[in-house]
């Protein structure tokens, strides 16, 4: 048990050194880092060591949110069926990062006291990965950073873009 904690500490610090050295465009005193084993809450929120982290610049469907997917098309008539897109978004994120080492670079906190962050698993930007695969959308109200990933997912009809859905912010407003 003690050796596992030492190994986790060493791996985290080595990863932090690599991470910080690869971001030489950011002054070290401005970089605020949270790192550790990720625990997925939903498609855009995680916990690391009890700290709640909301992914910067993206918005995933709510856990109970349903979306529509084409089911059958006959001539010019199309039938669709509901599917649990919010739960799928959460499950895909869990498969990718749950119980894995993450490094999150945060800038501020929101009104719910969550850290707003970009998170990385190895060299993969998880925020970008969620949007590029269609499990979340770019949250343009706060940032345009992930718009190109959204355009790609939409063009390729990935995830949410394979059917129709209500934008997460509209769903929250109506439910």
Predicted regions and their residues:
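Small beta-barrel nucleic-acid-binding modules, primarily SNase/OB-fold domains
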Residues: 2-175
């Amino acid at each position: 048990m003690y050796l596992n904690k030492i190994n986790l500490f060493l791996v985290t610090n080595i990863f932090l050194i690599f991470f910080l050295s690869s971001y030489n465009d950011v002054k070290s005193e401005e970089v605020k880092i949270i790192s550790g084993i990720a625990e997925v809450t939903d498609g855009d929120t995680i916990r690391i060591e009890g700290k709640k982290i909301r992914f910067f610049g993206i918005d995933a469907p709510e856990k109970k949110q349903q979306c529509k997917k084409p089911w059958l098309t006959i001539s010019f008539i199309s039938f669709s069926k509901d599917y649990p897109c919010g739960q799928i978004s959460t499950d895909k994120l869990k498969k990718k990062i749950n119980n894995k080492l993450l490094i999150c670079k945060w800038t501020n906190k929101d009104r719910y006291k969550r850290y707003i962050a970009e998170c990385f698993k190895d060299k993969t930007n998880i925020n970008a990965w969620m949007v590029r695969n269609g499990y979340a959308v770019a949250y343009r109200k706060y940032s345009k950073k992930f718009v190109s990933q959204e355009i790609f997912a939409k063009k390729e009809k990935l995830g949410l873009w394979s059917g129709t859905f209500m934008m997460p912010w509209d769903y929250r407003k109506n439910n």
